Regions:
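Post-DEXD/H (motif II) to motif III coupling segment of the RecA-like Helicase ATP-binding lobe
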Residues: 154-213
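Residues immediately C-terminal
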Residues: 126, 144-151, 159, 176-177, ...
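Structural recognition of the conserved hydrophobic beta-strand(s) that form the central parallel beta-sheet
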Residues: 119-122, 166-173, 344-346
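Short, flexible/disordered intra-domain loops and linkers
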Residues: 179-185, 293-301, 402-415
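Conserved RecA-like P-loop NTPase helicase motor core
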Residues: 152, 310-429
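Conserved interdomain linker/interface between the two RecA-like ATPase lobes of SF2 helicase motors
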Residues: 193-281, 285
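Short glycine-/polar-rich loops that comprise or flank the Walker A/P-loop
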Residues: 61-62, 86-87, 140-141, 164-167, ...
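SF2 helicase/translocase NTPase motor core
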Residues: 1-166, 240-249, 253-257, 264, ...
């Protein structure tokens, strides 16, 4: 007699890669705790569900709880759970829609009249009283999985994680929280240390988990208004970095303000026009926008990009944002895959696990000095898809304006880490020599030739 439906069963059509097998062995060797640090697109979800299936076979696991940062990730997890014969309760939004069902199935599991329960929830629901009141009744044989686990290092979320559940697995391409060592430590203290192997982008490409790519840095200058704001913010960031009594959130707020300014730099629209004029025949293109607005016109970058592509260039596009409903997202994905839509103009969707593997070309207009966002945005474009042999990436890089000596030193230190990531990404590209030559200009300007 086979494993009953609703209980984790490894699918016959899935073959784990060697690094996934190694990660699973590492997690079991660490007594059922640990954080998987694996490149975006390398199969963290499948690895986690494989762990659940093995725990069911060896330990009699009773409950799987998956915590995701966003609603769309709940539905993506549900799709993968279906492949493992699981029937998850999707616990998010109104408690009326899921609370009584969780209570009922939890009672059945505890009374041994039901073998297994799967619950997929969001960070927002995790901290709610309705979910917390249920968590305390989850049995000892429960596995909690934190997807995009870096988010769970925030104080309120970390405090909401159940301490009585001892089987814990964190998933993140970059578990280190940006300018928040305390949050990173709390996160790894809860889920467990980063497990071997740490799978880099290069490893994932070599293993065939991600496709190869060509990389084209596109340099953009700030206009006069943006340059003044940039210099002022950089000066304040310098003060915040030197101050002993600074609050981490003060520095983060300044860095975010400057990132939004850079992300929405008005000259990026001209750069986009220049690139796309010769690419109007292409399809499967993602335009990844900042959520900021032009400092002079106050127009959101998303609107300016849609206007340029659709009205001016006649490129068939639609928007894909956090506000797009789940059903509308599915419709857009289908139109995008078929080529009916040539492009998607998006905000944030590359940052947290949105799965649109049909992307073959991407124009990244949003700028981020957050290492996690940098890795996620570029790694997600490299997901394999039938007929997709390689990807093409146009990456807009804003050139900092002329700054005074003191501010220049701050800028140089901040830029060094960011430029290191651009260089690493260029080095892995199929056109590495060409891409590195373009970046050399920036390295020379800032005296960073040692990168």
């Amino acid at each position: 007699m086979g494993i009953p439906w609703g209980c984790p069963q490894f699918p016959a059509d899935v073959q784990l890669r060697p690094y996934q097998e190694t990660a699973i062995r590492s997690w079991f060797a660490s007594n059922g705790r640990g954080t998987l640090k694996m490149a975006t697109g390398s199969g963290k979800t499948i690895t986690a569900l494989a762990i659940a299936a093995r725990l069911y076979e060896t330990l009699g696991l009773q409950v799987l709880v998956v915590v995701c940062p966003y609603r769309h990730l709940v539905t993506q997890w549900a799709r993968e759970c279906d492949r493992f014969h699981l029937m998850p309760i999707l616990a998010f939004e109104s408690a009326r829609q899921w609370q009584s069902e969780v209570t009922r199935q939890l009672y059945r599991v505890r009374s041994h009249s039901q073998r297994f329960l799967t619950v997929i929830t969001t960070n927002a629901t995790l901290i709610s009283e309705s979910f917390q009141s249920q968590l305390r009744y989850f049995p000892a044989k429960t596995l909690i999985v934190g997807d995009e686990a870096h988010n769970l290092g925030a104080p309120r979320l970390e405090a909401s994680l159940p301490r009585h559940i001892k089987l814990r697995l964190g998933l993140s391409a970059t578990p280190e929280r940006y300018f928040d060592e305390g949050g990173t430590d709390a996160l790894l203290d809860y889920f467990g240390a980063v497990l071997k192997p740490e799978l880099t982008l290069a490893d994932a490409i070599r293993a065939g988990a991600l496709v190869r790519y060509t990389y084209f840095p596109v340099f953009v200058n700030l206009n006069e208004t943006e340059s003044r704001h940039y210099a002022l913010l950089t000066h304040r960031i310098g003060w915040a970095l030197q101050s002993d009594d600074r609050e981490p959130e003060d520095l983060t707020a300044l860095l975010m303000r400057r990132a939004r300014l850079v992300g929405a730099a008005s000259n990026k629209i001209a750069a986009l026009r220049s690139v796309m004029r010769s690419r109007l025949h292409t399809s499967h293109t993602l335009f990844y926008c900042s959520d900021g607005t032009d400092t002079d016109t106050d127009e959101p970058q998303l609107s300016a990009v849609v206007r340029l592509l659709g009205s001016e260039l006649g490129y068939r596009v639609n928007t894909y944002t956090a506000e797009t409903s789940i059903s509308e997202r599915e419709r857009l994905r289908t139109q995008f895959e078929s080529g009916e839509l040539q492009g998607l103009v998006a905000i944030r969707c590359l940052d947290e696990g949105v799965d649109v593997p049909a992307i073959r070309t991407a124009m990244i207009l949003a700028s981020s000095r957050n290492p996690r966002q940098f890795v996620q945005r570029r790694g997600r474009i490299l997901r394999p898809h039938p007929g997709k042999e390689r990807a093409t990436l146009f990456d807009t890089i804003v050139l900092p304006p002329q700054l005074d000596r003191q501010t220049w030193d701050v800028e140089r230190n901040l830029l060094k880490k960011e430029l290191q990531r651009f260089v690493e990404f260029a080095d892995l590209a199929e056109n590495a020599a060409e891409a590195r030559l373009k970046l050399l200009k920036l390295q020379q300007r800032y005296g960073l030739l040692d990168i």
